[in-house]
Amino acid sequence: MRGRGSRDTGTQSAAFASRPVRTTVDMQAQRAPLMEVKRNLELSTTLVKSSSRLPLPGSRLKRGPDQMEDGLEPAKKRTRGMGTVTKVDTSRPRGPPLSAVSTAAQKGPRKTGPRGCSAVGPVLRNQKPAPAAPAQKPGTSTAPAVAGKKPGKRPAWDLKGQLCDLHEELKQYREKTQTLDRENQGLREQLREVQEQATTLGTERNTLEEELASVRRRAEQSQQKLETLGARVLELEECLGTKERLVQELQTERLQLQEERSTLSTQLEEREREFQASEAALSSSRAEVLCLRQKTAAQVTLLAEQGDRLYGLEMERRRLHNQLQELKGNIRVFCRVRPVLEGESTPSPGFLVFPPGPAGPSDPPTRLCLSRSDDRRSTLTRAPAAATRHDFSFDRVFPPGSKQEEVFEEISMLVQSALDGYPVCIFAYGQTGSGKTFTMEGGPRGDPQLEGLIPRAMRHLFSVAQEMSGQGWTYSFVASYVEIYNETVRDLLATGTRKGQGGDCEIRRAGPGSEELTVTNARYVPVSCEKEVEALLHLAQQNRAVARTAQNERSSRSHSVFQLQISGEHAARGLQCGAPLNLVDLAGSERLDPGLTLGPGERDRLRETQAINSSLSTLGLVIMALSNKESHVPYRNSKLTYLLQNSLGGSAKMLMFVNISPLEENVSESLNSLRFASKVNQCVIGTAQANKK
């Protein structure tokens, strides 16, 4: 049996070695027989290890007290050799003989289970233990009857017969014991074979479990790899779709490029023909360029000569321009009559007459006739006295219909003198409401026809400076705007917290030994365009001191001085020039009414009027002193004359606008203004000198 089991085990091992790897379901199917074999082995081990109930050899059956008593009774003794031997039941189930088990194992049907499973397992599983024989009472015997007779019970005194029976029974028990030992030995060998087979099957099971775990790991790896490959396939499919679209786009682009190439090839051929023609033209042009270079060199030489000549002509122009201005007079007076405003009474005919010039009606007027009626009557006829006629002659008279542009044309030559390096000062003088501020600054913003002298002069200077840059001249402009109120200098360009701090402004020399004057704490703003000047004028209008007077609802109560410092340089010739342009809007000149009742507001107006008249009187005295060539000129008697002293002397050019009202009710103030202007017009302050370096 051991050899056959070994061969079966080898066959089964070879079968397992050559068997393909099965799934988990097959492995579970293989485990079921193995578990049954294990259970049968445990049952067999229990049967083998169960204790035998056979009597030990050489031992004697002990009797109890009841049996001893029965043996003492003579009536119950049996005759020796006539009774049956009592059989001891071991109550041990007997299994089938080993030969039957082996035969059943060999001839039993072979199951379709996994290979390597022996048939011993089913045999042991289906074998049932034999039912134990019922225990017999002591003294009874189960031995068969002798000679066909039913054996009787030996009497108690037949000890020898009983002993023989016991020996016979012991012999039978020994034979049974030997038989059981042989069967036990066979079962032990069979158990050993089954255990070896179980060990082999366990080893194979472990091997299969390891193979199964390996297969599972490989399956998981394959699944992961499959998922990775699936994702890669999707990615590649998406990439393939993108590549296909790109290929389609490239094919479309290729077709377009082919068309463009065809077009470019055609154009290239045309360009080659044009290039050949251009080369021929270039050869011709080179010859022309050579000729033109020679001509250019000649033109450069001529241009330099023309530049020198132009510079000489510019210097001659300046000299003649200045000579013309001197012939007109370094102090000139223009009279301007403002038009009648809406709501004012129209003057009577003949009140203001503008006689034509010497050349006739086409000649601009230079005279003004003002008629003044007298309330006195003749003592003889008691008739009204004739009107008094006052004639005045000036350098130019502007009637009420004159436009701002006409006024500026007359002073544009004077503004040009400032650019040439001559100090220039232009005044606007007259009573309150006569149009001084309108003449200097203009009307409402946004209407170019109403622009005053200041914005027009700045536009003219910027334009001429731009033209002069072509001749090598560069100009810079620095503007300031101050007012003199009650002999106090205020900065009209102050902003923020500096507003109203005009008292801190003082007139000082620019430096030790310098004749140039400057105003401390005042803003000096570089300007280069008209918009910057407009912004400064708008700011000054907001800061200027105004008040209500008897002549005007909103009257300027201070002298405003717009100063523009002009600096020019010709770097190529090393020339420099500089001069100030002063545009002054004087405060209204009015006489005080002796019978005026003074209230709190009238006292302020009184002080303002006194300061204004004092400064205007000083201005007249300064002009007279300059005209008379006096050694002392009272510049310091007024802040106005002290600030303008460099523009009032013999090296300066001065022009005064006398503005008068067309109303008859203002005839007294108009006559006073005209008389003052006539005195100024009669003054001569000498020849002006340009400030050149």
UniProtKB/Swiss-Prot annotation:
Record has Repeat as a keyword: no
Residues noted as binding ATP in the record, renumbered to the chain: 430-437
Coiled-coil parts of chain: 165-334
InterPro entries, sorted: Kinesin-like_fam, Kinesin_motor_CS, Kinesin_motor_dom, Kinesin_motor_dom_sf, P-loop_NTPase
Sorted UniProt keywords: ATP-binding, Cell cycle, Cell division, Coiled coil, Cytoplasm, Cytoskeleton, Endosome, Microtubule, Mitosis, Motor protein, Nucleotide-binding, Nucleus, Phosphoprotein
Compartments (UniProt record): Nucleus; Cytoplasm, Cytoskeleton, Microtubule organizing center, Centrosome; Cytoplasm, Cytoskeleton, Spindle; Early endosome
Keyword Nucleus attached: yes
Biased composition (Low complexity): 49-59, 127-138
GO MF term list: ATP binding; ATP hydrolysis activity; microtubule binding; microtubule motor activity; minus-end-directed microtubule motor activity
Domain of life: Eukaryota
A cellular component annotation (GO) from this entry: microtubule
Kinesin motor domain mapped to chain residues: 330-683
Coarse class of the protein's main subcellular location: nucleus
Gene3D superfamilies: 1.10.287.1490, Kinesin motor domain (3.40.850.10)
Region annotation (Disordered) ranges: 1-24, 48-156
Positions where Phosphoserine occurs in the chain: 52, 59
Family designation: Belongs to the TRAFAC class myosin-kinesin ATPase superfamily. Kinesin family. NCD subfamily.
Cited function: Minus end-directed microtubule-dependent motor required for bipolar spindle formation. May contribute to movement of early endocytic vesicles. Regulates cilium formation and structure.
Self-association and partners: Binds NUBP1 and NUBP2. Interacts with PPP1R42.
Protein name, per record: Kinesin-like protein KIFC1
Native source organism of the sequence: Rattus norvegicus
